[in-house]
Swiss-Prot record:
Organism this protein belongs to: Heliobacterium modesticaldum (strain ATCC 51547 / Ice1)
GO MF annotation: an example: structural constituent of ribosome
Chain's role: This is one of the proteins that bind and probably mediate the attachment of the 5S RNA into the large ribosomal subunit, where it forms part of the central protuberance.
Gene from which this protein is expressed: rplR
GO cellular component: cytosolic large ribosomal subunit
CDD domains in the cross-refs: Ribosomal_L18_L5e
Superkingdom of the source species: Bacteria
NCBIfam families reported for this sequence: L18_bact (TIGR00060)
Family to which this protein belongs: Belongs to the universal ribosomal protein uL18 family.
Keyword RNA-binding annotated: yes
Official protein name in the record: Large ribosomal subunit protein uL18
InterPro entries, alphabetized: Ribosomal_uL18_bac-type (IPR004389), Ribosomal_uL18_bac/euk (IPR005484)
Length: 122
């Protein structure tokens, strides 16, 4: 039986392999995602300067006002809409998607699709 620590270590190894190839620039920053059991986080990062340009999570006030759980697909969709809205307000319309070592399924896919529908291109 695979333990939680083993799964997380495997995910982190995958993420390091992905990070070697996926780099955010000033023209196309990186949209990275982190998923925990009860929450989901997304941020747009410029890897050249090492700065976070925009961030959204299931802990934001706008998210909490929607009265949705952060640990399900509906919550991930809401976070995807929030990150896209904030990025478009800052003039960012093209990003590179970094799934963070998670498989493109469930909450990760829901966040990505919602961000695409809200106007982000990747």
């Amino acid at each position: 039986m695979i333990k939680k620590l083993d799964r997380d270590a495997a995910r982190q190894k995958k993420h390091m392999r992905i990070r070697k190839r996926v780099k955010g620039t000033e023209e196309r920053p990186r949209l990275c995602v982190f998923r925990s059991l009860n929450h989901i986080y997304a941020q747009v990062v410029n890897d050249v300067t090492g700065r976070t340009l925009v961030a959204a999570s299931s802990l934001d006030g706008e998210f909490k006002a929607a009265n949705v759980s952060g640990g399900n697909i509906e919550g991930a969709k809401k976070v995807g809409e929030l990150i896209a809205k904030k990025a478009l307000e800052k003039g960012i319309d093209k990003v590179v998607f970094d799934r963070g070592g998670y498989i493109y399924h469930g909450r990760i896919a829901a966040l990505a699709e919602a961000a695409r529908e809200a106007g982000l291109q990747f």
